Design a protein with these regions (language model features):
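Core beta-strand elements of the Rossmann-like FAD/NAD(P) dinucleotide-binding domain
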Residues: 26-28, 206-218
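Conserved mid-domain beta->alpha element of the FAD-binding
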Residues: 35-43, 146, 221, 365, ...
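Conserved FAD-binding catalytic core of PHBH/FMO-like flavoproteins
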Residues: 148, 158, 201-206, 218-337, ...
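Helical element adjacent to the flavin cofactor pocket in flavoenzyme catalytic cores
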Residues: 134-161, 184-200
Length: 401
């Protein structure tokens, strides 16, 4: 029996008109929906076994907001087999920069405790058992490496399409037929420019039609924790309600590197606890000044919209602390652990100093996202029929900004 699935909120009269105007058809053994680490790895692996595929990714030039960063040992072994371990190692920071977790009042403040994760017998034993120990590399950088490898391996008939989304798909006895739409609109073109241009590798890639009909033996759903393919199939994620909500703030602070090195305070994670903020700072690359702040907030008690760039900047300042020459109190922020308003005069007076008198390490906020920490497991990865398979890296869910 044929079954057809439509993604809620995608189809519209306008999109249907576009698809009718400029549709094209592809026939491939495998359709990959999603161009993250798993989708790109799948494309390369299929090419290695002589199987052409078509990969469709909604974003045009990848994602710049750092997300996952720790590549575990088994993943590194698989990436070694793919032939990209050297490129990953070349971009991974020195281990001394990320072997510790630190607990502190602020990054430059009082150090409460530190855990060296590479000092125990377990790490020594693991290092003897594998040629490819774990690495620490930001997901956008890993995706760039995997994209280049997928393009290098692409067979005749293999395509890597950026700026395309899967609108619907139908299962039938011979596999799957899917409808893809190019994500292009006047508003998107004005806002993102080339970001949403379609890029392809392989047969007829230069045509970049507005819509594609793809006939495939298999559909690989690699479109992440919020997979619309998975949702359309009715495959649920089982688990409790979100454990915590966060503002994820990408910022750069190159000036931190020498200050941390001269004090021997490098780490991967900094758990910061002070009157201005309680948060975790993730050092993706200390030498390059690449950081992400995970600032918790509480829906229902806080207005997420009010936690804007200024509020996030204040939270980061509180977590970084003061320069070595400063002795002012920690600046307040909307992520304060006290119940009083961080902008009130009582907050400033109780700290003994106003926020303006505090000198912190210079930094620049690049992007802000929101996500919910959850503990969920998909009920099934395969339907066992119709060529449908769900693949995932299982990262913490972080919605598109």
């Amino acid at each position: 029996m044929n079954r057809k699935f439509f993604f809620t909120g995608i189809r519209s009269p306008r999109s249907s008109a576009i698809m009718a105007k400029a549709a094209s058809t592809r026939r491939v053994p495998a359709l990959i929906v999603g161009g993250g680490p798993v989708g790109l790895y799948a494309s390369s692996l299929l090419s290695a076994y002589g199987v052409p595929s078509l990969l469709a990714e909604r974003a045009a030039n990848g994602k710049s907001h750092p997300r996952a960063h720790l590549i575990n040992t088994r993943s590194m072994e698989l990436l070694r087999e793919l032939g990209v371990e050297r490129q990953i190692r070349e971009q991974t920071p020195p281990m001394d920069e990320w072997r510790h977790f630190r607990y502190c009042t602020s990054v430059l403040g009082t150090q409460i405790a530190a855990q060296d994760h590479m000092a125990g017998r377990e790490w020594a034993a693991l290092s003897e058992m594998t040629p490819s120990p774990m690495a620490h590399l930001s997901q956008p950088k890993l995706e760039a490496i995997l994209r280049a490898e997928a393009e290098r391996r692409a067979l005749g008939g293999t395509e890597l399409l950026s700026g395309y989304e899967c609108v619907s798909f139908a299962q039938h006895g011979g596999g799957v037929t899917a409808q893809l739409r190019r994500v292009v609109s006047p508003a998107a073109s004005a806002s993102y420019g080339a970001r949403y241009s379609a890029v392809g590798t392989g047969a007829d890639a230069d045509a970049a039609p507005d819509a594609l009909t793809v006939e495939a033996d298999y559909l690989l759903a690699c479109d992440g924790a919020h997979s619309r393919v998975r949702q359309a199939l009715g495959l649920r994620l089982r688990g409790p309600a979100p454990l915590q909500h966060f503002k994820s703030v990408h910022f750069v602070a190159p000036a931190l590197a020498p200050l941390l090195r001269e004090r021997g305070l490098e780490a991967m994670l900094y758990f910061c606890f002070n009157r201005g903020a309680v948060a975790v700072l993730v050092a993706h690359n200390i030498s390059q000044g690449e950081w992400v702040a995970q600032l918790p907030f509480f829906p229902g008690l806080q207005d997420a919209e009010a936690l804007d760039r200024a509020a996030c900047t204040a939270g980061i300042a509180a977590c970084l602390g003061t320069l070595p020459t400063g002795h002012a109190a920690t600046p307040p922020s909307p992520f304060t652990t006290t119940s009083s308003s961080p902008s009130s005069s009582s907050s400033s007076s109780s700290s003994g100093s106003s926020a303006s008198s505090v000198t912190v390490v210079p930094f620049e906020v690049k992007s802000i996202g929101s996500w919910a920490m959850s503990s969920k497991v998909i009920e099934r990865l395969s339907l066992g029929r119709g060529g449908m398979q769900v693949l995932t890296t299982a990262p913490p869910p972080l919605p598109h900004r």
